[in-house]
Amino acid sequence: MVERPLLCREAVFDRQNQLSGHLFRLLQSSPLADSQGNSQPAIDRQLLHILGASPAAWNSQTAFLPLSSASLNDEAIGRLPAEKLVLLIRLSLQDEHPPSLLECLSLLHQRGFGIGLFHQPWHPAFSRLCHLADFAVIDVGASQATDIHDFRALFSRLGCQFLALNIDSPDEQRLCQQSGIDFFHGRFAAGLPIRQRSSRDDPHKAQLLNLLQLIEGGAETPEIAEAMKQAPVLTFRVLRHLNSPALGLNHRIDSISQALIMLGHQRLSRWLAILLFSVEAAGFADWLLIESALTRGRLMEELGSQLKPKLPADPLFLTGIFSCLDRLLQRALPEIVDELPVSDDIRHALLVRRGPFAPLLAVAEASEMFDEADIEAATRAAGLNADQLNQALLAATAWASSITGHRE
């Protein structure tokens, strides 16, 4: 068994169908911060330690942390960045003294933390604390339709926002949306179809694939630049993407030829692969796919730098992001890979799960499934430990958020 707890981060969506942030918890715990007995403070302590140890900006989008009120005096909270961080507080049955809770939450508010309050009207302190809530939180999995409406009515006069957790189906999400809920968490998006058209119907995706074929096939710079002249709209999109703040380049790039000179073929392939995942009118499932691809690529790169620093970073990234192309393009992955002259290491990892990149791809894929046994097995097979995976996941999440925050 992996000796340390594993981190889990789950998508949170807004009313515009966009990915707005993440809920962070331990894989072995609940997003409701309701572990049995007195174990929740220990779980909270482990979660706070993992997050506090990361130098990555994992809260560049809103980060939601479910915690017990019994953990609010933990010094580790003070070491976390307060900006865009919302503490989702479950009132402990052992914590029934309203004045002390009121003082504690007020201090956290003053320090810049957002406060979310689980819907616990039976708790003695609940009514005294409602006015401090920036977010009102409800467990949809344990609620009826009337409960959701009543919950919305109770908090509406306080001017807070509404977060629904554990939404399992599209029907439940629609009910929450109709009830005025602002943010949505749960597995409902995983079963929805993506909205993208296939590459055969999307000229920009077809042009991007053609450009990737040229670059990965070793075409010379003039040939690649000439191909781009045939697609002026795509050239504009590529250059706008390369000059976006998310990429952090030191010099402005004004032409594809300049991009090839400044970035090199491999680095340009990387950013073209990212651009493949641009989506118009993206829905919940599209955003999950975009984040999955970006996080897989960056996670493999982060883990590779720890485990196999001699392995080149860009091919690891491309392996991760290309592993999602079948869902993006709605075609069989072997068919797509056959059209891209990628290296044997990438090809073998994608198609037969062999070669030096395969173990890290297995870790990246397992980390999305929330199955503890599968993640532990993949992590062990790759020669990694839980701390390495946790920190790499936070770094990958921070990077992917910086990209999705600058989507077209």
Give residue ranges: language-model regions.
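Surface-exposed beta-strand edges and their flanking turn/coil or helix-capping segments
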Residues: 20-22, 34-40, 78-80, 100-102, ...
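Short, solvent-exposed coil/turn linker segments
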Residues: 68, 76, 81, 90-92, ...
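Conserved alpha-helical "signature site"
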Residues: 43-46, 146-152, 165-408
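N-terminal start-of-chain detector that recognizes signal peptides
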Residues: 35-39, 57-61, 107-111, 155-156, ...
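Bacterial c-di-GMP phosphodiesterase EAL domain
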Residues: 1-86, 91-96, 107, 260-267, ...
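Short, low-complexity, polar/charged sequence segments that are solvent-exposed and flexible
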Residues: 26, 43-45, 83-86, 106-109, ...
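The catalytic core of metal-dependent phosphodiesterases that act on cyclic dinucleotides
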Residues: 79-190, 312-315
